[in-house]
Amino acid sequence: MGYRSDVGFACTPMVKQIIEQVCEWDSDLEELFQCAQDLAHCAKSGRWFWEYAKWYDSYPDIQIMENLMTILDRSELYDEYGMIRIGEEHEDIETKGSPHEFDMYVNRSIDI
């Protein structure tokens, strides 16, 4: 079964182009994005959501995504993307980049 997370990732057109190029080279990353919901409001920007995903650092596709975000951060391009991961445990929330720049935020609620 494994530990599951919900993950949102949004980016500028520049970062989307990089992702599309890397997907052409790497079938694991391409499959990761094919499994995501594409929520982009326009064709240029990137906006994806993975629900109930195994977001393990040991998986090759996740390693590529993590490396891409690290490169963007080290290049001071952290405002070119935003990522939020919410794990199963209440306090397991991870953010990278600048999610607020893409109107991304965490909202926990109970519907009865």
Region locations from a protein language model:
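Short, extreme N-terminal segment that most often corresponds to the first beta-strand
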Residues: 1-23
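Charged interaction segments
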Residues: 21-112
